[in-house]
């Protein structure tokens, strides 16, 4: 039995949760439920992130205390999580005495190791509001990539971190005025001194996502900087000892320690030994942090450095998820797609969204698009039309004609074996967080089950004399195949599974038992387990969202939507002159003397081509080998000083990143793209 501790990023307690938040929490909840079904001791903790200037100022504007504000939103968050079937073992808060003790203890350990220093810095100060401005209360143009409207600590476009003083055309979010520079003594954590610790952690981390590893390599190349861990009063948070409450710990120092506090609180309540899960590096337990891709910097640099230097076990891995778009675009209040968790729950069951997200989630850091039309179609087709429909087609015969008892014989052992054989592949897919692949495997089995029922037509057999035994066996096999499918789906749609357990008079408590058929087993009367989503309900979610935000006043003038610079039109015949082929990357290597190029050897199904691709900044050669991509196969060879380039691989980019195109699973080298 494995000992596994899982955390999820702490939601900030100054506003309601939206569906973009739920993407990450649903992902981790599915994985945790799977681990528990495997029989592992898996503990899942979270809590509210409750400190910082945004909370202080919002509470002031509402005429309440910060404590009242965070209590209000913490309760609302927990209710949203509960109703979305996110099953935390403990939900805590960063604003409590336990977390304060942990923060001060870790700070003192860092200070005793001379990893904390003080220095005067020029800081943004709002002369109108008469206060120093936290990083997130200064906005301007990113000094690295020149993206506009970025926060004062990091860029959401390129991921760069910087000081607010480096922003181009900065402005105060509070007053809109240009901040002035004012000196203040701050406390710094010596991150560069722990570079080896971080690199050792990365090298030992076999589960780190390639995108995270690439980003870390980029940050190392830029050079690590000491981290400002303090903020000036007024501030809602924990005061730094010895500063007479004039300096406070930066929220990003005490927030991750909320993971420790939440788990310690769980241990205290349940008589668990904290060290068994989160002791030192010698512990055999596993520790995983599920986070959004926008906070990789804090979790994959600062956090391992702090833990490794204060005697705590470092994460076994950090798993990041992408952002959520709706109908192919960024979530929008005006379009009604900035959907809050509660707005969804007021109109639809959580199972549908949990299933849709699972059908899209992989181990990669890909953004997920919630296409609402596809969401309706997929939910109705897969959950209702494929899975639940199996039970509804068979249960009535068993209940009415055969005393609600399943057959003692298996009608089609070969088909039963196929459902069992897929167990290992589905298990591996769940373990590796390849939920989309797991769903595809499960739905392929659902198709086979429906084909079986369509072929034997029990509703016709029931009308024929002497076919009672066959009807019994066919419908029993149908119910058993349904049972296996539902057992496989338990981590994804737990509430539908709970209703199924009532219907089947069984509890799915062991993943190993998932593929086992029930023999001579008594079932209950079937009741509908899921109903089709009506488009009107989705429309109502959009309308409710629009109404919620229609009176909001935008603090700044509305920006124009970005326009695509589409190339001149070409004819179909022109397009067909370009021969696009599926290619497998069999070799990839650096090109000596080239800053941007990688040398690729591509297999087109028996034919190989050599290509020099300008993707070095985005990919390591070893990460590309074995991938499938798309290439222009009939591009005239081009002689370069490094050798002959015999084509071009396709990649997308916006000037800030490069992303090679990968075909859908099943595409083979040499296939033409049309």
From Swiss-Prot:
PROSITE patterns: AA_TRNA_LIGASE_I (PS00178), TRBD (PS50886). Binds 1 zinc ion per subunit. GO terms for biological process: methionyl-tRNA aminoacylation. It catalyses: tRNA(Met) + L-methionine + ATP = L-methionyl-tRNA(Met) + AMP + diphosphate. A motif ('HIGH' region) lies at residues 11-21. GO terms for cellular component: cytosol. GO terms for molecular function: ATP binding; metal ion binding; methionine-tRNA ligase activity; tRNA binding. Its main location: cytoplasm. Belongs to the class-I aminoacyl-tRNA synthetase family. MetG type 1 subfamily. Keywords: Aminoacyl-tRNA synthetase, ATP-binding, Cytoplasm, Ligase, Metal-binding, Nucleotide-binding, Protein biosynthesis, RNA-binding, tRNA-binding, Zinc. It holds the Pfam family tRNA-synt_1g. It comes from Francisella tularensis subsp. holarctica (strain LVS). Is required not only for elongation of protein synthesis but also for the initiation of all mRNA translation through initiator tRNA(fMet) aminoacylation. This is Methionine--tRNA ligase. The keyword Flavoprotein does not apply. Transmembrane segments: none annotated. Its EC number is 6.1.1.10. NCBIfam families: metG, metG_C_term, PRK00133.1.
